[in-house]
């Protein structure tokens, strides 16, 4: 074990397993038991090519996104991102003085469901600079992202985060950030029933 590898043993975010996974040596099996297996042999990409693939996929699935969003997600510099963007057929749009990048025309994507229960650390919350997220009103930022790095499970209603939820042995607890009208409550109950047919939803 090298001096660079030694700190991984005691790292609280995955330890040796994370080091081996990020190094391409271990991966999760597709089985239900969540066992780790050796990764199959593969030929790694050139670092620059790999970055372009990652950025292309990000723009495809998260776009339109701003440079701030991409810097937040990848932890790459603005200069690095601009170089990578220049090699991709990314499209742009202007809104409120900001430039947004994307690969797929937004109008060609399927409509967002009215009500979605998002898991903790959901990619929808992590894919955008949290202070500029199109889904998270700034007033609710600290209710979703706490000071210890936790990202709570949330309710996405009509395209905006509208509350937090948690599950216990008896039911699903929903804490709305604002009062829900009867139509909204009905939509939330319907979505919850589809996910948890054997558990009631309690709106606190």
What is the meaning of each model-derived region?
Residues 1-125, 129-131, 137-204:
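Long, low-complexity intrinsically disordered regions
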